[in-house]
Structure formats: structure tokens, C-alpha cells
């Protein structure tokens, strides 16, 4: 594959505003491109709970296996290969130590994602024993912060800091690329931030600005990509529109924006939920969450209109798999930008699960948020092209262009209004309260991880029975039309 920019292929794989910006086109734009790949999660809700923690571009392809996105990197000298979960909702890169309690167990659960052996790397250096991340259900990892050389596609960053878990309950390491203020040593210990991956790329001259764009592609695609330091104009429709990121307790720590409208439409009907008392709402953009978590009242209305069966013990909504063939859209409004999600992107394979009438049951990609901040996870992000501009504390959105094979890479420059072709939304809603609650993938809970609760061979742990404080009447749904799960 020949390209005129620096490409790091790591198979991990209307409008009112200012005039659009001058495009930053160079023969050799500083970008880093990474492939990302999707992987299946047997129980996406349990997995979300377990992993919720609280002229320069780099592109990485993303591997897509329906409910989780991975990227492949190498660490150390010589190189040690790892497959990590890409997560915009956290900020630390961490991986399991080869001799960790979990990886050393009989069933060798770390084989698929790999592990890191510091003693085998000549470029390894110990930093501290401060790494300790705990998730909302008590799972987590503890160990050391270290530095070593990271290779991500064709780029190399030396003396890169990351966490190594010697005690862990997840076989899957995480590549967190959020704000440095959300790093474990900052949030839990009050220490100064270190340069995580996007910031380290800027520091090493690989990209100009601490910004990246994410293109997950559709549910049927195996791969997507993340482009550090640039945008790919062939991956979205229309224009990018820019919104301010909301602070949490006065600090920029998570990718939270204001959701102002939600609607459901088909060829024959339209249901608008924008009058709900739950809107406008603070919503977190989180690639580490498989599903989308919306305010309870909105989910109740959607479930009623679609006939979704809510199973309270697992916290999952189920629909007939045939629903994916219907011409139905869920539309999200963010002051001005409108992102449309087709129903086929919200109907997820649940294996051989069936309703009592024999119809195949699929997981519905929207579930109640309970008391936690609403989360726009992968069932939303696949339909949106998102630019995360950490330098300017802004998010730019457009509707994704599915299965595009063309590329037009433009570099994100420095300073204000640096995202190519993006326009600022005039008078965006900002009056939303973001509490940063919940340990989404990576979001530290502030608790210390001290024990490993019954890890499975895949690194999973038993999940709570259901979402916190979800109305019991959600259990109804499709039972009224004969769709009752057969257990």
C-alpha cells in the first residue's frame, strides 16, 4: 500500500457557523494512521460495566468484531506484540505482565491479546509502583508504571510511559487515548500527568496537534481506522460541525458533549423524544463501550415504540433479529449536527437466543444509563465520523460514509479552528451537568484494586444483575406482542 503521508498501519484496527477553514494540505502531512479491528463480546453490557473505568498524522486500522475494537502494537526491544482495546474513554495504556497472576493461570487467558515481559526488553525502565486501576464492579489491575519503546505501525516513540498489570482480572489490555487529566496517577494520586499516546506523538513530532479522528465503519465491516493528527474527508458526508467539550467539575477530563434531541422515524411514522425532561443531556463519546446508554425515560419511549423486550437480570434489551431489515432510523441532534443511525446498526447478534415464539432474538444497541452519565458507545459511533480535538477542547461531527475505500488525508494544524473544513456551531447548548460518574473503560473509580474476583478464561468477571436504578417497568416491552425470551 503506497501513500504520500506517514501511515502507521497497525492492524488493531441547517448549519449556522463561521466560514469553513482553509484546508491543511501538504505532500507529506504529519499524520499517524492505525487500523482497528472489531472483536465479539459475549455479553456487551457486562463487559461495558467491567471495563468502564472510570503535516503530521498517524493512522491505525481498527479490527471490528461487532462489539469491541482492538489495535495491534508492539512494546520493547525486541518487539513484543500486543492486542489492546482502543478506548477514548480512558487515558492510560496498560497491558498484562507475562508473569501476572492471570496470565500464569492454567487456561492461559492472555494468549489472544498478548502480554509484556519487562525482563525481556533492553529498553525497559521502571518508573513507579503507582499503577492501580479499579472498575465499577471491583475488577481492575495493579502493578507498575514503566517506560519502554512503543512501535505503532511505522512510527516509534521511545521512553513511552504505560502501566503493567501484575495483578489483573482482565486478559485484555487497554489503549486509552483520552485527556491526560483522566490518567490513573492524576485522578487517584493527584500527581502530574505524563504524556500518554496522543500527547507523546505531538511531543515526538509525529503529529502537530493533540487531535485524532475515528472511523469505525459499519457493523458488517471487519476494520475501521483512527487517524492521529488528521482527518480523512473521504470517510464522511457533508461538513464537519464543531461543538465544545463540557467540563467535569471545571476540568476537561472526558469527551462529554450536549445531546439536545433524539427521534425515531420510519417511512410511515416519526417519534420525537426531544421534549423529554432528560434533554438536553450530557453524553460521553466512548469507543470502549459496546452499546449506547441513554437516559431511562428516553429508552423507555424507544422500547415502547419498537417493542423491545428488556431483560432486567442482564440489563439488555432484545428485539427480533428481523428488525434489522426495517427502514427505521434513530436520529441524534447536538444543537446543530444531526447524526442518523440506521436500525441495522443497532441490532446485534446474540447467538442462538430465541423468543418463545421461535423468532431469533438479537441484542438492541441502546440500553438505560441508570444513574450514570449517558454514553454514546460503538452502536452510535459507527454511524458518526468524530474528530477529537484535545488541544482546543472540541468535538467535530459528521455522518459517516460507510465502506469508503478512498482516502483524502488532511493534517490538523495548531491553534484555534485547526480541524480542516470544520465549522463552529453557533450558540451550542452548554447548559448540561456532567458528573463524570461511573468507571467507564478506563475511568478511574478512585478505589484501589486489591483482589481478583473470579476471572473467567476471557478475563471477564461476574457482572451486576442489571443497570443501577433502572425502572422495573422496562421489563415489559415486546412481551405485549408475543416476544418473550425462551430461557
Swiss-Prot record:
GO cellular component, alphabetical, reads:
plasma membrane; side of membrane
Organism of origin: Aspergillus oryzae (strain ATCC 42149 / RIB 40)
What Gene Ontology molecular function terms does this protein carry? aspartic-type endopeptidase activity
In Pfam terms, one family for this protein is: Asp
| Recorded topology in the membrane | Lipid-anchor; GPI-anchor
Keywords assigned? Aspartyl protease, Cell membrane, Glycoprotein, GPI-anchor, Hydrolase, Lipoprotein, Membrane, Protease, Signal, Zymogen
Attached lipid, kind GPI-anchor amidated alanine, located at: 463
Signal sequence span per UniProt? 1-20
Sites where a glycan is attached: 72, 99, 111, 132, 272, 329, 403
Q: Indicate what this protein is called per its UniProt record.
A: Probable aspartic-type endopeptidase opsB
| Enzyme class per UniProt | hydrolase
